[in-house]
Amino acid sequence: MALQLLPSTLSVPKKGSSMGAAAVKDTAAFLGVSSKAKKASLAVRTQVATAPSSVTTSPGSATAKPSGKKTLRQGVVVITGASSGLGLAAAKALAETGKWHVVMACRDFLKASKAAKAAGMADGSYTVMHLDLASLDSVRQFVDAFRRAEMPLDVLVCNAAIYRPTARTPTFTADGHEMSVGVNHLGHFLLARLLMEDLQKSDYPSRRMVIVGSITGNSNTLAGNVPPKASLGDLRGLAGGLSGASGSAMIDGDESFDGAKAYKDSKVCNMLTMQEFHRRYHEETGITFSSLYPGCIATTGLFREHIPLFRTLFPPFQKFVTKGFVSEAESGKRLAQVVAEPSLTKSGVYWSWNKDSASFENQLSQEASDPEKARKVWELSEKLVGLA
């Protein structure tokens, strides 16, 4: 049985949260796992090498040494939104190497557990933990539960996202923030800030934080110029808390709500946040901070709230017209590369892939790479999540 961190008590989400999932209270318990299995899965792992010393080094394992000497331990990666789509595909790709233990941080832990089994992920290669990014309390509870599990943290992947392209009225998180920005940006911002302490404590040689971006938030691309275009404006909506009641639910302060733009704006925040982490922490800590666009995953559940005609026509359009279609499996491999490949350790980079599936450093738009705007987004976000 795969190791799972399941909540021992449930509570109803705060009024205002439209995510529809039960929130987990502070306590959590391991269920159905022997103490021996827990120790094997949670301890800082070492592997005894018996192969000749000529074995090539790869992420999560070191060059093999003579028998009886220890090699680099297995890496631990936390992936948010790992119950489906890109997150699940990346979790599977990393777990299959045997070099990574994957913590699947998901709102619906039962769905995540079933998805891992359906994907064929081996027992003991993953841990399912509850995380609802629409609740800042849940984010803090996740961090507490993760630390109680006494696992190291070597890589954090901020992947989870919601997309409400047809919405014309906002919904709000448990903390009263517009849902798309609240989940995609603010929840991840708090998670990443809190877990920086754990990343800094890790003895893993290639510690990383990866924040998934999107081409739709990058206005120097064709896709980024499809209306409505991402634009954060002067951030007056973010400064007002995105509550909608006393101000705008849009980051730029626009009084009319547009779900598609809210998503795109949240991805600009993701890419700005990655760069600000790089500026503030990389030189001091050596941690690699990066973002990526893995390609157009036209069949992903991210589009489930789009109109039926779009869901029908978009995949073949991407496959046969733009040639930009990427399967979930391929996108997962690309995200796994950013997590583990030695060639992708450069910090502050936004990774993309060409049609030959070769990675390259992509250029971000002026807004998505504006250091002053990144600083302002950081400082406003600190206030909204209670860190300032």
Swiss-Prot record:
Alphabetized InterPro entries for the sequence: NAD(P)-bd_dom_sf (IPR036291), Prochl_reduct (IPR005979), SDR_fam (IPR002347)
Enzyme Commission number(s) from the entry: 1.3.1.33
CDD domains: LPOR_like_SDR_c_like
GO MF annotations in UniProt: protochlorophyllide reductase activity
GO cellular component annotations of the record: chloroplast
Annotated pathway: Porphyrin-containing compound metabolism; chlorophyll biosynthesis
Compartment(s) of residence: Plastid, Chloroplast
Keywords for this protein: Chlorophyll biosynthesis, Chloroplast, NADP, Oxidoreductase, Photosynthesis, Plastid, Transit peptide
GO biological process per UniProt: chlorophyll biosynthetic process; photosynthesis
Gene3D superfamilies, sorted: NAD(P)-binding Rossmann-like Domain
Residues of the transit peptide: 1-74
Primary localisation category: plastid
Reactions it catalyzes: chlorophyllide a + NADP(+) = protochlorophyllide a + NADPH + H(+)
Annotated family: Belongs to the short-chain dehydrogenases/reductases (SDR) family. POR subfamily.
Known role: Phototransformation of protochlorophyllide (Pchlide) to chlorophyllide (Chlide).
Record NCBIfam families: LPOR
The protein, known as: Protochlorophyllide reductase A, chloroplastic
Organism listed in the record: Triticum aestivum
Organismal lineage: Eukaryota, Viridiplantae, Streptophyta, Embryophyta, Tracheophyta
